[in-house]
Structures are given as C-alpha cells and as structure tokens.
Swiss-Prot record:
Name of the gene encoding the protein in the UniProt record: pyrI
Lineage, opening ranks: Archaea, Thermoproteota, Thermoprotei, Sulfolobales, Sulfolobaceae
Keyword DNA-binding: no
Binding, Zn(2+): C113, C118, C142, C145
Family of this protein: Belongs to the PyrI family.
Keyword set includes Zinc: yes
Subunit structure of this chain's protein: Contains catalytic and regulatory chains.
Organism: Saccharolobus islandicus (strain L.S.2.15 / Lassen #1)
Swiss-Prot/TrEMBL cofactor(s): Zn(2+)
Keyword annotations of the record: Metal-binding, Pyrimidine biosynthesis, Zinc
Protein name listed in UniProt: Aspartate carbamoyltransferase regulatory chain
Molecular functions (GO terms): metal ion binding
Amino acid sequence: MISSSKRDELIVSKIRKGTVIDHIPAGRALAVLRILGIRGSEGYRVALVMNVESKKIGRKDIVKIEDRVIDEKEASLITLIAPSATINIIRDYVVTEKRHLEVPKQIRGLIKCPNPQCITNNDVEAESRFTTISIKPLKLKCEYCEIYITEEDVIRQIL
C-alpha cells in the first residue's frame, strides 16, 4: 500500500535546462505565461501545475519551461503579480541558481499608469515610475500623478 504522503505527491518530470518558477500564488500561472510571451506555439516544452498545496503559501502554481531562461524585465513583472515566487535556473537537471523575488521600492517603465491624464500617457519621452507603498496587498503610487494602483490593476494590464 502507498503511504498517504506518497499518494499526495504530484510528479512532473525534471527538465534538463531551463527555468522553474515556484511559489506562484494559486491561479496566477497563466499570467506568468503571458508575461513570458508563451502562448503554446513557440516550441518550448512547458509544464504547468496549478492550485497545489504549499507549506509556504497555502496553495500555489508552478511553471517549468525547458530551454528558456527568463530575463530581468520578465522577472520584475513576475514579482509584481507573484511576490512570493522563486525562480530556479536549471542546468544538467540541477538547480544552479535560485532567486527569491522581491518587489522593488521603485518600479520604472514596466507598467503603465492607468490615469489618462498622467504625463507618462501623453509624453513619449516620459517613463512610468511607481513607488511601492505596500507589498501585501500590492499598492503602488505613480510618482507623477500620485494615483494608486493595485495588484489587480497590474494583472489587468498583463492580461
């Protein structure tokens, strides 16, 4: 007979090289794929695990992408919708780099201000700049027009 802990395990094969994004809040894996521009026809082998138990955050999603390493801009965007996420870089089936994401104090040029009157929406040269007010829940303040945006606003922009 299989023990309870063995029955509850979810097995997804290891990847030889690529990226594993772990500890994504449940239900956010599809938004992560959207950030990465993965729609399914790019040729990457992708494993998507959604809504599994996690000791760290209750329920979580996991994304594994073979033969793809994410860049800093992508990691910064993922941080905004999954601040508890961990990015693992895999080489020869071994984690060679592990990064715990953190929401930065300043966010520049990654997202747009939703205020149509904001200078960043009316001047091509103006780069959006936000200050992080809180992380849980995510609350950002535009440095130009002082409007506040939430995690849900960021997700709407991504989707």
